């Protein structure tokens, strides 16, 4: 990416001046966006994968007796986990490409290196990245909204679990509060003919005391936060690439070397 004359330029300017010029060519917005995207996708993919696995275990253990009742849920979780693998790989490669494009456009805008300039093909490539990143941001906005569904559902489940746990410690018999239930069928996890489909009384209290239940709640919240961080990174990418492209177009119209 750097021209051959870069080594001669460093020798002529000195080490300090060369380092300053190199640091000036770093696309800090793209670098920050890359770090945010890596962090967000790691949270979303890692925590989302484990949250789905824990959800399958909880439903299989406490809410169904017949394996046919949750076969659709198990298939959905399996396929969605494969989608998570693909998302992690795609965003890793795409963020690397965006960071490289940020180095290219930033160096061309600041004219850091004498022979390093943009071409019409390079500007078209930058415009392509802008459009693709914008489309990805819109799609990921829908993913972020979709991620809010299991997060809010786990938050709703967490409330009766906390209530059941506290009453277990203060009441001699939890069966006195048998009306406190969690029904997996009303959230679409199981068909309405699934038996028992819900947990009440002592069964609910035993679920709420398991480590898997509270870990699943934390994992869904972390996955939701990761999706938000990745969405922020995509919007930062759009802003940074659009700004660099606009400057390149402006300098090109003025007839300056860029």
From Swiss-Prot:
State which ranges are Cytoplasmic (membrane side): 1-22, 104-128, 240-258
Give a Pfam family name.
Myelin_PLP
Q: Where are the transmembrane segments?
A: 23-48, 83-103, 129-149, 219-239
Q: Name one GO cellular component term.
A: plasma membrane
Identify where the record puts lipid attachment of type S-palmitoyl cysteine: 18-19, 22, 121, 124
Q: Which GO terms describe its biological process?
A: axon development; central nervous system myelination
Q: Name one GO molecular function term.
A: structural constituent of myelin sheath
Tissue specificity comment = Central nervous system. Highest levels in spinal cord and medulla oblongata.
SMART domains for this protein: PLP
The record's InterPro entries line, in alphabetical order, gives:
Myelin_PLP (IPR001614), Myelin_PLP_CS (IPR018237)
Topological domain ranges for the Extracellular compartment? 49-82, 150-218
Instruction: Please state where this protein is localized.
Output: Cell membrane
Where does this protein chiefly localize?
Answer: membrane
Recite the UniProt keywords alphabetically.
Cell membrane, Disulfide bond, Lipoprotein, Membrane, Palmitate, Transmembrane, Transmembrane helix
The membrane-topology field of this record reads: Multi-pass membrane protein
Instruction: Please name every pair of cysteines joined by a disulfide bond in this record.
Output: 181-200
**Function (record text):** This is the major myelin protein from the central nervous system. It plays an important role in the formation or maintenance of the multilamellar structure of myelin. May be involved in neuron and glial cell differentiation.
Q: Give the PANTHER family listed for this entry.
A: MYELIN PROTEOLIPID, PROTEOLIPID PROTEIN 1B ISOFORM X1
Record family assignment: Belongs to the myelin proteolipid protein family.
Could you identify this protein by its name? Myelin proteolipid protein
What does the record give as the organism's lineage?
Answer: Eukaryota, Metazoa, Chordata, Craniata, Vertebrata
């Amino acid at each position: 990416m750097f021209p051959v004359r870069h080594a001669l330029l460093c020798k002529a300017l000195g080490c300090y001046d060369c380092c300053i010029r190199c640091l000036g060519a770093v696309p800090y917005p793209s670098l920050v966006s890359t770090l945010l995207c890596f962090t967000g996708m790691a949270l979303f993919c890692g925590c989302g994968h484990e949250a789905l696995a824990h959800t399958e275990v909880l439903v299989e253990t406490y809410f169904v007796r017949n394996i046919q009742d949750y076969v659709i849920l198990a298939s959905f979780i399996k396929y969605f986990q494969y989608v998570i693998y693909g998302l992690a790989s795609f965003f890793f490669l795409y963020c690397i490409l965006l960071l490289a494009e940020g180095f290219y456009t930033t160096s061309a805008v600041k004219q850091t290196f004498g022979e390093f300039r943009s071409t019409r093909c390079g500007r078209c490539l930058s415009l392509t990245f802008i459009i693709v990143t914008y489309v990805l941001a819109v799609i990921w906005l829908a993913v972020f909204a979709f991620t809010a569904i299991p997060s809010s559902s786990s938050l709703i489940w967490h409330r009766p679990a906390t209530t059941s746990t506290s009453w277990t410690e203060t009441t001699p018999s939890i069966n006195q509060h048998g009306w406190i239930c969690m029904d997996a069928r009303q959230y679409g996890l199981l068909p309405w003919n699934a038996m028992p489909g819900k947990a009440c009384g002592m069964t609910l209290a035993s679920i709420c005391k398991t480590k898997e239940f509270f870990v699943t709640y934390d994992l869904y919240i972390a996955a939701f936060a990761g999706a938000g961080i990745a969405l922020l990174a995509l919007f930062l990418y759009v802003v940074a690439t659009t700004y660099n492209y606009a400057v390149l177009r402006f300098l090109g119209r003025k007839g300056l070397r860029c």
